[in-house]
Amino acid sequence: QRLRLNCRRGLAVDGWWDKTLSEQSLVGTLPHGYYDDIHYGADYYTGHFVLEIPGRHKITDLAGVSPRWEISGGRLVVSAEIGTALGPVRKEILVDGDQPNFEIIHHFQWPSCPNGTLRLGHVTLNPELFEQASLFYRTHNGGDVAETFPLHNEPVNHLAPVSALVSASHGLGVTSGVVELGDARRWVRIEVEKSAAAVTGHILYAPVDERYFFRLVLSAMEMDDTSCHVASRAVFSDLTVRLRLTGRGRR
């Protein structure tokens, strides 16, 4: 495997390759200008977090860092501490030395966090690799059997706000801690430790410029008409969100 990180953007994943599945990257960053459509004129990173608080600037980990690295337990560990207005966030990338997989870990040390939305674990698929006609996502939503949802090239936006008080319209339970997304030949498996952080999953998909945009976003905090009465939360004073990415496919 090969993993390229962006030290100017808080160790965001520029690209991740699993050579057993493809010579092209499976996930990574789609830079500004990748799409001609002005509605998609942004950098679409993988592996970062975004905290949005009404009436305030966004807080992210997309800052320049000088990472430390070491070999521990047969894995490469790349780490950095990112200062924010709410407190430090420690970020670690763990790369397996034997099998093609890696982990992204965010450890939040925020004594108090205002009400808002905290989205992280962004995983952006490479639209030049996965076949558009057979794209799908799959997860458990409370049952014993995983549910598979073919996209059929229809737009999906689970993060579309319902109103000014309700920040997201749909979400995935991810009750087994696993989400898979890809096509009929190959897919990416994202595993999250739900016992440490009960995140929800959200899918974004749209056909764009004869290609498409397909991304999974995990959420650790959303807003609704009840949470708007909460001034701040202490749950992020010692919270770790950990996810592992593995490539899968049919031989």
Q: Locations of the language-model features?
A:
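Extended, charge-rich low-complexity regions and/or helical-solenoid scaffolds
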Residues: H32-L51, H57-R68, E92, G121-R138, ...
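Beta-strand-rich recognition/accessory modules
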Residues: Q1, G10, W17-G33, E52, ...
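Amphipathic, interaction-prone secondary-structure segments
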Residues: R4-L5
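An exposed, glycine/acidic-rich loop-and-rim segment of catalytic or binding clefts
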Residues: L94-V166
